[in-house]
Design a protein with these regions (language model features):
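A solvent-exposed interaction/effector surface
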Residues: 1-211
């Protein structure tokens, strides 16, 4: 049975649809940076997803080839995630999607080293005849956060964010979005296959204790 991060780490990937406080450990990701409206058909965001999955599946299927990764075990590729921000804006203004910056990412198993990642980029470039140079090995130490499961349209997320911020303040915390800590989304549903009213997205914000 392949290891499924969503099931083994439910506290990170399957929170309740009410806010909670959680400490997120440092994790390694494959990531692509970009900007622009995520709904744009030929935009940077949609392009980033193809690049990420090209590398993710090269690593996942590596055991069938000659490159052996030490400690490898079979696993389900973790869900797509995104860090989002807009310059000079605390949080996100959903009406200004064209101003959004993002780091699109997929979690790597702990056994994948930077050298394994670099091998995967070379392998995918060679096999798929595609440029994967935008993909990077991205360690992210997220730390203390408030998070909540959002069900429904991405455009309705502000209501969930308001609940999170009310809960955060009631428990003695304040928002800590900075140049290195971001609005974070984890996409548990495929919008191409799921009705918009049933989309599941983990929304996560960095916080700190109120002084």
């Amino acid at each position: 049975m392949a290891f499924d991060y969503k099931k083994e780490y439910k506290e990170f990937y399957m929170p309740k649809n009410k806010p909670g406080i959680i400490e997120i450990p440092k994790m390694n990701y494959i990531a692509v940076r970009g900007k622009g409206n995520p709904n744009e058909e030929n935009g940077e965001y949609k392009s980033s997803i193809g690049l990420l999955y090209g590398i993710a599946f090269t690593i996942k299927m590596s055991y069938k080839g000659t490159h052996k990764i030490e400690g490898f075990f079979e696993y389900v590729v973790p869900p797509l995630e995104g860090l989002w921000w807009q310059e000079n804006t605390q949080g996100l203004d959903y009406a200004r999607k064209e101003d959004m910056h993002f780091i699109s990412m997929i979690r790597l198993p702990d056994f994948v080293t930077k050298e394994d990642f670099e091998w995967a980029v070379q392998e995918a470039t060679k096999k798929k005849m595609q440029d994967f140079s935008k993909v990077e090995f991205f360690p992210y130490d997220e730390g203390l956060c408030v998070q909540c499961m959002h069900i429904g349209s991405y455009d309705d997320e502000p209501a969930t964010v308001d609940l999170m911020h009310d809960y955060m303040k009631a428990n003695g915390y304040e928002l800590d979005i900075t140049d290195t800590r971001y609005h974070h989304e984890i996409y548990l549903s495929d919008p191409r296959k799921c009705d918009v009213s049933r989309l599941k997205t983990v929304v996560r914000h960095p916080i700190r204790k109120t002084e």
